[in-house]
């Protein structure tokens, strides 16, 4: 009987109810623990500087546990109330910050006064010229010396006037008297023109009358003079006389002295007086602040402050950079304001870097295991796992066959406001942005186009090499229009299940129609848009079914629904023709590699977030990176920032940008490659030959640098800086370029007495260039302007590349070979003559390359052209470049006592400054 009762009791209580009781009990324990303890907001070690400086912590409760040499876990407790010493310290810091702000404001206003004073001189001089007033012996005083300060002369006195042809009121009065005695139509017409000219000058911005009453008076006089032109001579004369009387009254009103200032109704004078008043107010506030600061300084004269991981005296704290101090004080102000919340609270911060505050003020202790805290740490995780298990178990019971839900589109959606990229973040592709501006206008205001019966392009295909910003432009279009943006890759439609790709296409367009107007961006569309009928499955493979569905969706949805498909590819030649026809992708935007201006604009965009030295010339970087994409340029600046950080600099210098450019474009330096002295000397002669010939030829590009440091697959390199965008080649330029290519081989022959295989690439490039001159560009006098290089476009149905067909006779082939040989021999002769003429410079350049390994354009000019080379000056330049923006080494801690107990810590303090 008892067993039956037990079974009935078990049946009455479900497992879910038991789990609920356990979870409720554990949750109650957690809540009780959190209610009894007040936690403070301290998470980082840099906060401790302000907490210790302002005496917000109880020193006896401040402890740290060392995890390793650099990381600690610290804990502590806030005081229950502020100390008087802490209030005094905060008052001093606040006064010092205010002092910095007032001094900066004083300097700004002082500069503004200088600018306004010049404007007052100009407007007052123009007034004297227009009024005809004579300058007194002591000068015409605009602003009295009452506004002078012991340091600055703020008065404005005009002692002479510049020569000018403007008519004055005095001269007009004389003209009026002459016309009144003998009034004629000609004299009155001349008088009216002079009065109009005077009115224009008085109403001009150069004089700048700021009184609205005077402006209206001048406007009325102008109208009166204009209306009198159609009246009789006597009426004209009377109107002109009345106008001159009114102008005289206006001149007297402007010349009236008020509060030791004349011309107070001119904007320049009024602004000058207001700025003077502001300057005096700032000086008064600064004097009051200085008195309070001097008094507060006496109370904290013996305090040692923790400032950005340094220990500073009060005197040293006041010498810190005001901007750095302001940022530091803002954190202290925040901690001071948060004390009301943190009062009496405890805190604990794990895995924080060790700093001076932790080292000096926090007590060290050994970590003690707290198994009860482990339980509360793991308890939330266990509860989350339990809840997730119950949710998934319930879902799996009702899912059935819908578990394999592969037909949904995996497109990622950026809603309005999430996409912060606009056209301001895109540079170097101005033509592409102009093409896409119409798309943005449609997304912002569709009715503007549809009301007139116009149709917006249904599809936009962005074509360009990798890294030119196709995806970025698509995001910018969505961000500029502030519309939803669906992004997906062409490979996302390819799956192992039949029909998944077509299903995802349908689902993608359904989602897009619900969010219209919007943009669908399909990256690498060639993954699904290739020519049909060439796959492994004939016309029935999965990719072609996906393409067919895409074609139907593009041709099926209406433009008024506001769904625009943008796609990107760098292989437009493999796309299906049906995909490219008008009505689908009916607008193609070519995004090519940027030119010099484009590269410069791209560099400016990426340089915004990098702290760079002002001496860096972004245009020089743009000029030295022909053929680079936007991604390459961004990588160059990122590499330069990493190099600067590795060298311990506070800002990126020109040296890092050059190293980063060479690393990205030519490969990383291989300094570990073992090269004997003979090989190094031969490489130096080889590169010196290239350099000297490149400098001497008439049409060569300037030499940027020469190096014998192995990089990539080469043992050395001579780098040139193009003067302009290369859109075409001239015959003389090509001959000079061939001579430069032959310069390295000629230098080896002359100075080494032998030739090496290092000139292999030079000979290949020279031969290819000479053959192009003969066969493609018609630059051979013997063979004439005939193209012998017949190219057949491949890459069609079977994907074969381009191939060349020989369409000329064997005799012509021999003539081509002999002409190519002649051009190369001429280039060899030119290079040999230049090397022999500049033999001494080649020798010196070789020696300096062996010593310094790399020479820049300034060094090369001094050696080859100017003949004023100084190796000492070169070493000084290298030292200055190495020390530029170097971080100051931290002050080492004081040495420990002579007897050190290492039994507790297990380590010996590092007193020699050696890195561990």
UniProtKB/Swiss-Prot annotation:
Signal peptide: none annotated. The chain crosses the membrane at residues 17-37, 372-392. One of its GO terms (biological process) is protein catabolic process. Its cofactor is Zn(2+). Keywords: ATP-binding, Cell inner membrane, Cell membrane, Hydrolase, Membrane, Metal-binding, Metalloprotease, Nucleotide-binding, Protease, Transmembrane, Transmembrane helix, Zinc. It is found in: Cell inner membrane. Residues 1-92 are annotated as: Unknown. Residues 38-371 are periplasmic. ATP binds at residues 464-471. The keyword Cell inner membrane applies. The active site is at 687. Its main location: membrane. Residues 883-916 are annotated as: Disordered. In the central section; belongs to the AAA ATPase family. Acts as a processive, ATP-dependent zinc metallopeptidase for both cytoplasmic and membrane proteins. Plays a role in the quality control of integral membrane proteins. This is ATP-dependent zinc metalloprotease FtsH. It comes from Protochlamydia amoebophila (strain UWE25).
């Amino acid at each position: 009987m008892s067993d039956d009762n037990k079974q009935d009791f078990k049946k009455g209580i479900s497992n879910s109810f038991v789990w609920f009781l356990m979870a409720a009990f554990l949750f109650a324990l957690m809540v009780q623990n959190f209610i009894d303890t007040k936690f403070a907001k301290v998470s980082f070690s840099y906060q401790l500087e302000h907490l210790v400086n302002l005496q917000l912590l109880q020193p006896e409760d401040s402890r740290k546990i060392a995890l390793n040499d650099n990381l600690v876990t610290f804990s502590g407790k806030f005081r229950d109330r502020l100390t008087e010493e802490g209030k005094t310290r905060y008052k001093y810091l606040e006064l010092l910050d205010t002092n910095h702000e007032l001094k900066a404001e004083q300097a700004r206003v002082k500069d503004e006064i200088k600018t306004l004073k010049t404007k007052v001189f100009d407007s007052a001089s123009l007034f004297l010229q227009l009024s005809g007033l004579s300058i007194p012996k002591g000068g015409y005083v605009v602003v009295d010396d009452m506004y002078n300060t012991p340091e600055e002369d703020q008065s404005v006195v005009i002692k002479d006037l510049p020569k000018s042809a403007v008519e004055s009121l005095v001269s007009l009065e004389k003209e009026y008297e002459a016309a009144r005695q003998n009034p004629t139509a000609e004299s009155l017409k001349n008088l009216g023109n002079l009065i109009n000219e005077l009115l224009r000058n008085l109403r001009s911005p150069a004089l700048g009358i700021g009184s609205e009453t005077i402006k209206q008076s001048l406007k009325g006089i102008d109208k009166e003079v204009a209306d009198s032109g159609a009246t009789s001579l006597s009426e004209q004369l009377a109107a002109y006389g009345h106008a001159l009387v009114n102008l005289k009254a206006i001149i007297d009103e402007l010349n009236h002295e008020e509060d030791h200032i004349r011309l107070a109704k001119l904007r320049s004078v009024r602004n000058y007086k207001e700025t003077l008043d502001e300057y005096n107010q700032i000086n008064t506030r600064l004097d009051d602040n200085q008195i309070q600061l001097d008094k507060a300084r006496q109370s904290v004269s013996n305090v040692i402050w923790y400032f950005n991981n340094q220990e500073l005296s009060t005197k040293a704290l006041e010498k810190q950079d005001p901007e750095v101090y302001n940022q530091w004080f803002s954190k202290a102000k925040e901690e001071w304001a948060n004390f009301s919340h943190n009062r009496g609270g405890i805190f604990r911060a794990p895995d924080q870097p060790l700093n001076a505050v932790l080292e000096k003020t926090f007590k060290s202790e050994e970590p003690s295991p707290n198994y009860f805290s482990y339980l509360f740490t793991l308890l939330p995780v266990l509860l989350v796992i339990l809840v997730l298990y119950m949710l998934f178990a319930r879902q799996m019971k009702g899912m059935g066959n819908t578990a394999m839900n592969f037909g949904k589109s995996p497109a990622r959606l950026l809603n309005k406001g999430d996409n912060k990229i606009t056209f301001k973040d895109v540079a170097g592709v101005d033509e592409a942005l102009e093409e896409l501006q119409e798309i943005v206008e449609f997304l912002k205001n569709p009715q503007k186009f549809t009301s007139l019966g116009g149709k917006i392009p249904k599809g936009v295909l962005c074509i360009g090499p990798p890294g030119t910003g196709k995806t970025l432009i698509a995001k910018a279009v969505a961000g500029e229009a502030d519309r939803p943006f669906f992004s997906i890759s062409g490979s996302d439609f390819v799956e192992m299940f039949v029909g998944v790709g077509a299903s995802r296409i349908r689902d993608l367009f359904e989602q897009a129609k619900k969010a219209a107007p919007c943009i669908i961006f399909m990256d690498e569309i060639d993954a699904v848009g290739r020519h049909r009928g060439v796959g492994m499955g004939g016309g029935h493979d999965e990719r072609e079914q996906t393409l067919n569905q895409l074609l139907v969706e593009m041709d099926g949805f209406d433009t008024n629904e506001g769904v625009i498909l943008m796609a990107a590819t760098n292989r437009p030649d493999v796309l299906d023709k049906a995909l490219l026809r008008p009505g689908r992708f009916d607008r193609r935007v070519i995004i090519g590699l940027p030119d010099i201006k484009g590269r410069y604009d791209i560099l400016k965009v990426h340089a915004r977030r990098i702290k760079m030295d002002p001496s860096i010339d972004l245009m020089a970087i743009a000029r030295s990176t022909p053929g680079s994409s936007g991604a390459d340029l961004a990588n160059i600046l990122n590499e330069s920032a990493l190099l600067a950080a590795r060298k311990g600099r506070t800002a990126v210098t020109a040296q890092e940008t050059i190293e980063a450019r060479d690393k990205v474009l030519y490969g990383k330096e291989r300094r570990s490659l073992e090269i004997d002295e003979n090989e190094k000397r031969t490489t130096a002669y080889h590169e010196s030959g290239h350099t000297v010939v490149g400098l001497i030829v008439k049409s060569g590009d300037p030499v940027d640098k020469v190096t014998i440091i192995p990089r990539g697959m080469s043992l050395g390199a001579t780098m040139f800086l193009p003067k302009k965008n290369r859109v075409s080649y001239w015959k003389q330029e090509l001959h000079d370029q061939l001579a430069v290519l032959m310069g390295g081989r000629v230098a080896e022959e002359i100075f080494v007495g032998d030739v090496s295989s290092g000139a292999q690439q030079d000979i290949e490039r020279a031969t290819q260039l000479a053959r192009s001159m003969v066969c493609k560009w018609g630059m051979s006098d013997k063979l004439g302007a005939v193209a012998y290089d017949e190219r057949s476009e491949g890459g069609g149905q079977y994907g074969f590349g381009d191939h060349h067909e020989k369409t000329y006779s064997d005799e012509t082939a021999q003539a081509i070979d002999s002409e190519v040989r002649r051009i190369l021999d001429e280039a060899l002769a030119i290079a040999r003559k230049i090397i022999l003429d500049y033999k001494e410079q080649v020798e010196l350049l070789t020696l300096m390359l062996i010593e310094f390994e790399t020479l820049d354009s300034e060094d090369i000019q001094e050696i080859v052209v100017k003949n004023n080379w100084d190796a000492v000056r070169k070493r000084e330049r290298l030292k200055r470049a190495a020390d530029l923006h170097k971080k100051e080494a931290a002050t080492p801690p004081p040495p420990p006592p002579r007897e050190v107990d290492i039994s507790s810590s297990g380590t010996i303090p590092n007193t020699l400054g050696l890195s561990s």
